Amino acid sequence: MGKGSSKGHTPREAKDNLKSTQLLSVIDAISEGPIEGPVDGLKSVLLNSTPVLDTEGNTNISGVTVVFRAGEQEQTPPEGFESSGSETVLGTEVKYDTPITRTITSANIDRLRFTFGVQALVETTSKGDRNPSEVRLLVQIQRNGGWVTEKDITIKGKTTSQYLASVVMGNLPPRPFNIRMRRMTPDSTTDQLQNKTLWSSYTEIIDVKQCYPNTALVGVQVDSEQFGSQQVSRNYHLRGRILQVPSNYNPQTRQYSGIWDGTFKPAYSNNMAWCLWDMLTHPRYGMGKRLGAADVDKWALYVIGQYCDQSVPDGFGGTEPRITCNAYLTTQRKAWDVLSDFCSAMRCMPVWNGQTLTFVQDRPSDKTWTYNRSNVVMPDDGAPFRYSFSALKDRHNAVEVNWIDPNNGWETATELVEDTQAIARYGRNVTKMDAFGCTSRGQAHRAGLWLIKTELLETQTVDFSVGAEGLRHVPGDVIEICDDDYAGISTGGRVLAVNSQTRTLTLDREITLPSSGTALISLVDGSGNPVSVEVQSVTDGVKVKVSRVPDGVAEYSVWELKLPTLRQRLFRCVSIRENDDGTYAITAVQHVPEKEAIVDNGAHFDGEQSGTVNGVTPPAVQHLTAEVTADSGEYQVLARWDTPKVVKGVSFLLRLTVTADDGSERLVSTARTTETTYRFTQLALGNYRLTVRAVNAWGQQGDPASVSFRIAAPAAPSRIELTPGYFQITATPHLAVYDPTVQFEFWFSEKQIADIRQVETSTRYLGTALYWIAASINIKPGHDYYFYIRSVNTVGKSAFVEAVGRASDDAEGYLDFFKGKITESHLGKELLEKVELTEDNASRLEEFSKEWKDASDKWNAMWAVKIEQTKDGKHYVAGIGLSMEDTEEGKLSQFLVAANRIAFIDPANGNETPMFVAQGNQIFMNDVFLKRLTAPTITSGGNPPAFSLTPDGKLTAKNADISGSVNANSGTLSNVTIAENCTINGTLRAEKIVGDIVKAASAAFPRQRESSVDWPSGTRTVTVTDDHPFDRQIVVLPLTFRGSKRTVSGRTTYSMCYLKVLMNGAVIYDGAANEAVQVFSRIVDMPAGRGNVILTFTLTSTRHSADIPPYTFASDVQVMVIKKQALGISVV
């Protein structure tokens, strides 16, 4: 820390004695009610991630009151929460001259709570001591138009961090009314006194017992002192809403008994299907006002709910439900987005089938219909089935799944799911996803694996069109595609004839059977269901004998050939669109039934995760630091870190890298430790990066933490802040990038050092610290003093940086400074000490002299004369004294006078006029000769003063005669005459210029147009204003004009062009031109004071004939005005 430069002094710091003590009382609205409630009482209530009770039932946090309400329609108000408050956060600084005012408009409030405080409260003395301080605030309410002080508050003590307090006020005036916070202590103007005050918030309190119907809530009261300056966060482990579940369903065992009759019963369940049903049909928080229960397909959800409850391997050797929903819906979102989250987690999609909202799940199911070339629309190109494939970049083989881990404080965990074979073949292609409502690692793994297998296995999309048969399935149904072009053989068609007696079918196209294996043919029976029968023989390629003919097989029905070497091609319909011609366009994506078994049995985890907080889930590393030290020319780094909680069975991996010359990172060292500290030794200079992460015995890794540090000489200070004080200057260096290992060397000089290399030999070394207070009676106001500062650390030192500053120029402040010094001295105490006189109007004359040594062996001596008198109960004193004292600044001699008036009189030649008088905080002198004067404000005599200079640099003078140079950056001049030459190096901008300049104007003649021909015709007028005090000349620049000649069939015609020019109405030119060009120009004198000059230019043309327009030309009118006898040019 900083040190003084006069003598050795160790700064003292008083203890912080201001601590915020507030009772946190909060009601958290948890959910739309009713809900099941806490899982395990107070063990399920966590404050700042710490349960109120531990797993053994012992108290972790004392003094906590928790009240729970399930959210029934009729529930009792929570006890201890009889008032309801609405807090308005301000966080506004309150300054001395700027009270903060707010208006209260709420009509129903009963009380107001003001929360206010200080950001810090500490005073630093000139010796570096940090002491308590105080600040005063007023809380005021405007009553009957005037401000009334309700609370007068003084905050007294010391704190280096924010301190808040609060007051509550009742008896409020009628609404609306104004409230304000006012600071009575002047604002600090220096860093030595930190006492910024703030109005943190105000709370409008209503004294009413509320029961909060249909709202599940938790009320918590806790003393915030247990949490220091931290914000108290609340988390609750709860079972959620009481849902409507099927009447034959047991949510605890997840068993369905008998046949469901379609009725419901209330129960808690985390089955995602019934959570979705609740959201869609609930009239308050869900979509029940737009969708009735009859508009949602509960039978489809019943099947999906059973699918979600089926047990699958959990990856640890046990089983768990396939899909559960443990989620909080905490923000308002679009209904479709929430619906999509639910459906994607259940591997289904919502479909409106025209009557109800139903759901189609991506799971194995029977095919609904078969399509081949015979029952689809055949396009002109002969390819009815059009295929598209997903891009390779969209086929991910690794996915990072974010899910909520109950064993890690319900924090977000990431499960990495990979397909190693696909990675080896295509390279790693990673994506990320959030598993909605997932609190199971196995479910998160299945969600990621489902995404990978869907993208890798189901890569095809088919589009085709059908007739009325397009209505045989709906979106979501599985269909089969038998495409002869894709298979390379005939795989489907129509049955032309059926002979049930001979079991022979006549097909519409030839088929070929394999040499081995059993071939099957699929036919449609009378119920519309596909039936497969064995093919026994084929005659003539189209007559097929089968093992049996299903009942109801009709002519022109569809057949499909199944061969042992031909895989069945299944697709799931995703859309059906009606075309303009009455056909239907179908889009379907590839369906692989085996995907479900691959996914549900694909999770295999090593080890078993514990269900306790002190399990083996590796925690995150936090608060990582690296401290560099030197040892015999070599450098060491001590790394320290901690974790949010103590976790058994974990160690820490450390990885240290250094930045190479090419910018890449080179590995220096790795280490593993079970401690939270580690020391690296024998490190070279360079820029390092250290990464630490926790790892458990099974190789699972927690979130890492990294810190960068530098083993090198420090950078020089980027800037130096110099703060003036009374006979002192505080120097505070700043680095461009904060480095806690860096301190600063301070060197001091009263003169500037021309060569920075001579700092150590030509200046005085002050010391090494983070800042320095250079304090001495020799540091005078109005003089420049120079600091030379460089950064130092264990590796080396930076270059010096120069800073120049001055002591304070606050004269009034110096008087207060001296007042403290004088009253603390022995002589000052003797002169100002009051003696109790026994009678009124009594007086006392005393002369005294003393000489002594105190306990610190300091020598002191004084002599003084003092007169005291008491009159009308008031004490008066006059005195004069001399002293010599030993002080901390050294030997000090004083001459003090105590009097209302001090004067010096020269009585020579009978003169009685004093040459110097001091009275009433003013000094009067007739004639003063000074070598140097420092005065923030200078004012001359007169009313108003003829001359003044203010501290902000504003100079005011009625008349100034400056014989030297004037340098100015900005300003305004009025009615100024420049007697001689003026040079302008920059840009000159003038609204109006009168003088030796040239003005010009130009314009083209108007034009007439006929068909595609246009020609000049019309008048232009130029007006020259008589606004100059000297003679000028008007110059008409050459104006050219001409007509044209035309010869057709030996006959010649002319189009003539005529120009007439007038000056003030008199013709000065009248000319005509055929095909030969004519030119007009003129110079006209314009004497000053004769009035304006008006020039009129008129141009006309003649036609070649009645039906042939003129072909004429004229240049622009151009006029210049110049001074008649211009400077800088002459003709001899």
UniProtKB/Swiss-Prot annotation:
Its main location: virion. One of its GO terms (biological process) is virion attachment to host cell. The keyword Chaperone does not apply. One of its GO terms (cellular component) is host cell cytoplasm. Keywords: Host cytoplasm, Host-virus interaction, Late protein, Repeat, Viral attachment to host cell, Viral attachment to host entry receptor, Viral genome ejection through host cell envelope, Viral long flexible tail ejection system, Viral penetration into host cytoplasm, Viral release from host cell, Viral tail assembly, Viral tail protein, Virion, Virus entry into host cell. It comes from the Viruses. Residues 883-1132 are annotated as: Interaction with host LamB. Residues 618-711, 712-807 form the Fibronectin type-III domain. InterPro entries: FN3_dom (IPR003961), FN3_sf (IPR036116), GpJ_C (IPR021034), GpJ_CSF (IPR015406), GpJ_FNIII-1 (IPR055383), GpJ_HDII-ins2 (IPR055385), Ig-like_fold (IPR013783), J_dom (IPR032876). Pfam families: FNIII-A_GpJ, Ig_GpJ_C, Ig_J, Ig_J_second, Phage-tail_3, Phage_Tail_Tip. The keyword Repeat applies. It is found in: Virion; Host cytoplasm. Belongs to the Caudoviricetes tip attachment protein J family. Interacts with host LamB. Attaches the virion to the host receptor LamB, inducing viral DNA ejection. During tail assembly, initiates distal tail tip assembly by interacting with gpI, gpL and gpK. During virus entry to host cell, binds strongly to host LamB in an irreversible attachment. The binding induces structural changes in the tail leading to viral DNA injection through LamB trimeric pore. This is Tip attachment protein J. It comes from Escherichia phage lambda (Bacteriophage lambda). The gene is J.
